[in-house]
């Protein structure tokens, strides 16, 4: 799996080179005086955005380390639930069963939408017949019902399809399963590494795969994007405009989930999340994704500041009560 080398921290595929969970060891809480760490895990789709955020963050926060792995959205939530991380990167919304496990442990959290993405369907660049597909046709391909291109469209070649998919640890897999497969099993070659999926499609003339928009953008000289046709005959393709306004059929938000306790007790975590929202998606754009509307960041930042202000007032009240006793 690809390793993202960050300025001031390191993101690894399965683990993070920091202590057990983030902590704050002092400092005033601003800029160069801020000290401590915050730890995350999760989506490989979100990882490039975190990398860009860290490049900016580390310039003024050399003693405030942020680290996040890219083991996949599902694996990230497992560590989040187990209490091993302060935040979790996700390319899908948290599932009901994950919410229940957090609730059972008394773990409260904030959900932050940090960017927009469009799951992109791509075929080999030498494929000259697949230009658009319906969700139903994609379902036939990825369920194994359509084994050749001719099974998808009678005018296409009678050649075996080589369908490739992320594995079930990825939020992209979950998203595709829900949006395209109607939760029917995906029967395709599965890979934990998105770069390996891209490579498989580029090397196989009958290949087809799906991944985040930025992975397509980085490899569009080797791949051919497939447009999506809906039930009404409307055809959409992933562009920054269609992804941001949600008109692309496979648009989705990208998230960071942060524990309330970490936001309240770990100054590095709270300052980093304010930094993320104040960035207003520029890091996402730099990483090849699409920023959310500015009002989305402002609204979330206002909510976060209100939450932190209430916590600080509560702490001061508790301190005064202790002194009075």
From Swiss-Prot:
One of its GO terms (biological process) is phosphate ion transport. GO terms for cellular component: plasma membrane. It holds the Pfam family PBP_like_2. InterPro entries: PBP_domain, Phos-bd, Phosphate_ABC_transporter. Keywords: Cell membrane, Lipoprotein, Membrane, Palmitate, Phosphate transport, Signal, Transport. It is a lipid-anchor. Residues 1-20 form the signal peptide. GO terms for molecular function: phosphate ion binding. A lipid is attached at residue 21 (S-diacylglycerol cysteine). It is found in: Cell membrane. Residues 23-46 are annotated as: Disordered. A lipid is attached at residue 21 (N-palmitoyl cysteine). Part of the ABC transporter complex PstSACB involved in phosphate import. Belongs to the PstS family. The complex is composed of two ATP-binding proteins (PstB), two transmembrane proteins (PstC and PstA) and a solute-binding protein (PstS). This is Phosphate-binding protein PstS. It comes from Staphylococcus epidermidis (strain ATCC 35984 / DSM 28319 / BCRC 17069 / CCUG 31568 / BM 3577 / RP62A).
């Amino acid at each position: 799996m690809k390793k993202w080398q960050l300025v001031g921290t390191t993101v690894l595929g399965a683990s993070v080179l920091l202590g057990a969970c983030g902590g704050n060891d002092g400092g005033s809480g601003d800029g160069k005086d801020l000290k401590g760490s915050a730890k995350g895990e999760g989506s490989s789709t979100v990882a490039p955005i975190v990398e860009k955020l860290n490049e900016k963050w580390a310039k003024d926060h050399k003693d405030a380390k942020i680290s996040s792995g890219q083991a996949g959205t599902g694996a990230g939530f497992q560590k989040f639930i187990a209490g091993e991380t302060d935040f979790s990167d996700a390319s899908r919304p948290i599932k009901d069963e994950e919410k229940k496990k957090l609730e059972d442990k008394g773990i409260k959290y904030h959900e932050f939408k940090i960017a927009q993405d469009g799951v992109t369907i791509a075929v080999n660049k030498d494929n000259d017949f697949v230009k658009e597909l319906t969700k139903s046709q994609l379902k036939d391909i990825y369920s194994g019902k359509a084994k050749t291109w001719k099974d998808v469209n009678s005018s296409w070649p009678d050649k075996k399809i080589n369908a490739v998919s992320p594995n079930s640890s990825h939020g992209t897999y979950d998203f595709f399963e829900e949006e395209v497969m109607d939760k029917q099993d995906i029967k395709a070659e599965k890979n934990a590494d998105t770069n390996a999926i891209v490579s498989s499609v580029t090397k196989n003339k009958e290949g087809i795969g799906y991944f985040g928009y930025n992975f397509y953008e980085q490899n569009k000289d080797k791949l051919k994007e497939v447009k999506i046709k809906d039930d009404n005959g409307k055809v959409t393709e992933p562009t920054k405009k269609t992804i941001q306004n949600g008109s692309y059929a496979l648009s989705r938000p990208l998230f960071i989930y942060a524990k309330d306790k970490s936001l309240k007790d770990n100054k590095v975590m709270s300052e980093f999340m304010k930094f993320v929202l104040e960035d207003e998606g520029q890091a996402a754009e730099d990483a090849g994704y699409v920023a959310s509307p500015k009002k989305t960041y402002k609204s979330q930042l206002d909510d976060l500041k209100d939450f932190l202000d209430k916590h600080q007032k509560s702490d001061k009240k508790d301190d005064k009560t202790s002194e009075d006793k």
